[in-house]
């Protein structure tokens, strides 16, 4: 499906080498101040071509908003926007017209649809995530009204793990590293010099989230967040709170005890029973190494024959770097959606509006 969310929805369109990518945000309340400069600044964080640690494809990623905004305020109507593609090099992919790239969605898209756009992965390209970043920025404008913030940074690249968790540092880091930036850069450069790629772990936190968000049983907050993050290109695992470590804990260690001031620990990552507890929400997204590598590889062609091929084009050596910006956006979209869904949960909420 190409639409995300229940009450607040984002529908995206476009392909990597098409005319444009874009989206429609529906369900954003009327009367919200739309800060176009903020939205553009979020897109700039993800924009390619800004350093040697991302793809050389240099797109301006300037957003054009077509509808749903009047005098700088949301009208309650769908907000349509587009980001035009200007730096495609489709000829770089001509040798892939008859070939399925290992680690990519080429084979599976062809098996599902019987047709595929070989130019940069088409619809399956991470180019589409610019739309999610824009959508997440719109969602953050709503979250700002409730003083909710979402922060992400790169916790590790390859075997290098950050020596600290500093989101202020990450915002000023060229690779959004939470710490140990130079060692992480070295890991990326080493992989790239060997015509290879490297994976990453992204840490995200949401602060100021009120207790009560989540729609049990089948749209729990934790499952919605996990699905949103797993839907990002290259994410292969998501952890919440203490994550996989809880399987080796005793209950006495895992339980987050409480006193008058709140929780004494946060192994649950701010979510209990699929509902936000009021504690900080903590998530980790594990990104696989970029499948686009410049080594000769064995694969199949459209005829099902084994062939050797070597990739051309422009690609990120570590997708987790820009992926950290996308993770922030998806968490924002989920939280904004859950806020709107939760608004009618209690009768007293309806009475405040209509009583």
Swiss-Prot record:
> Could you name the Gene Ontology cellular component terms for this entry?
cytosol
Q: Which reaction does it catalyse?
A: 5-O-(1-carboxyvinyl)-3-phosphoshikimate = chorismate + phosphate
**Residues that bind NADP(+):** 46
Q: From which domain of life does this come? A: Bacteria
- GO molecular function terms attached to this record: chorismate synthase activity; FMN binding
In this chain, FMN is annotated as bound at 123-125, 233-234, 273, 288-292, 314
* Cofactor: how bound: Reduced FMN (FMNH(2)).
Kindly tell me the pathway this chain contributes to. Answer: Metabolic intermediate biosynthesis; chorismate biosynthesis; chorismate from D-erythrose 4-phosphate and phosphoenolpyruvate: step 7/7
Q: Name one GO biological process term.
A: chorismate biosynthetic process
Query: Known SUPFAM superfamilies for this protein?
Result: Chorismate synthase, AroC
Which prosthetic group or cofactor does it need?
Answer: FMNH2
Keywords, alphabetical: Amino-acid biosynthesis, Aromatic amino acid biosynthesis, FAD, Flavoprotein, FMN, Lyase, NADP
**Which Gene3D superfamilies does this UniProt record tie to the protein?**
Chorismate synthase AroC (3.60.150.10)
Keyword Zinc recorded: no
Entry EC number(s): 4.2.3.5
State the InterPro entries in the record. Answer: Chorismate_synth, Chorismate_synth_AroC_sf, Chorismate_synthase_CS
Uppermost EC category: lyase
The answer on whether this UniProt entry bears the keyword Cell wall biogenesis/degradation reads no
The record's annotation in HAMAP family points to:
Chorismate_synth (MF_00300)
Matches recorded under PANTHER family: CHORISMATE SYNTHASE
Q: Subunit composition?
A: Homotetramer.
Which family does the record assign? Belongs to the chorismate synthase family.
Please explain the role this protein plays, according to its UniProt record. Answer: This reaction introduces a second double bond into the aromatic ring system.
What is the protein name stated in its UniProt record? Chorismate synthase
């Amino acid at each position: 499906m190409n639409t995300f969310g229940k009450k607040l929805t984002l529908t995206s369109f476009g392909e990597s080498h098409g005319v444009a990518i874009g989206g429609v945000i529906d369900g954003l309340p009327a009367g919200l101040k739309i800060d176009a400069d903020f939205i553009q600044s979020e897109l700039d964080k993800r924009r390619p071509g800004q350093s040697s640690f991302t793809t050389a494809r240099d797109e301006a990623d300037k957003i054009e908003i077509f509808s749903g905004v009047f005098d700088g305020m949301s009208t309650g109507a769908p907000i349509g926007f587009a980001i035009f593609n200007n730096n495609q090099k489709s000829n770089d992919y001509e040798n892939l017209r008859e070939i399925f790239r290992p680690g990519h969605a080429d084979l599976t898209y062809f098996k599902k649809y019987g047709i595929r756009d070989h130019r940069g992965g088409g619809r399956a390209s991470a180019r589409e995530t610019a739309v999610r970043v824009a959508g997440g920025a719109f969602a953050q404008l709503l979250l700002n009204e409730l003083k909710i913030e979402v922060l992400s940074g790169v916790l590790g690249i390859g075997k290098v793990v950050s020596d600290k968790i500093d989101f202020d540092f990450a915002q000023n880091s060229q690779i959004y590293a939470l710490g140990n930036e130079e060692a992480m850069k070295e890991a990326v450069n080493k992989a790239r010099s060997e015509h290879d790629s490297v994976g990453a772990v992204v840490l995200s936190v949401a602060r100021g989230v009120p207790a009560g968000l989540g729609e049990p049983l089948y749209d729990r907050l934790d499952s919605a967040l996990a699905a949103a993050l797993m839907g990002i290109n290259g994410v292969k695992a998501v952890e919440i709170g203490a994550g996989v470590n809880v399987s080796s804990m005793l209950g006495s260690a895992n339980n987050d005890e409480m006193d008058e001031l709140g929780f004494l620990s946060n192994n649950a990552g701010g979510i209990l029973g699929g509902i936000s507890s009021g504690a900080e929400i903590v998530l980790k997204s594990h990104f696989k190494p970029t499948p686009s590598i410049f080594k000769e590889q064995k694969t199949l062609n459209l005829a099902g024959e084994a062939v050797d091929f070597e990739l051309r084009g422009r690609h990120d050596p570590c997708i987790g770097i820009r992926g950290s910006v996308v993770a922030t956006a998806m968490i924002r979209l989920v939280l904004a959606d859950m806020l709107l869904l939760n608004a009618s949960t209690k009768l007293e909420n309806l009475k405040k509006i209509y009583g």
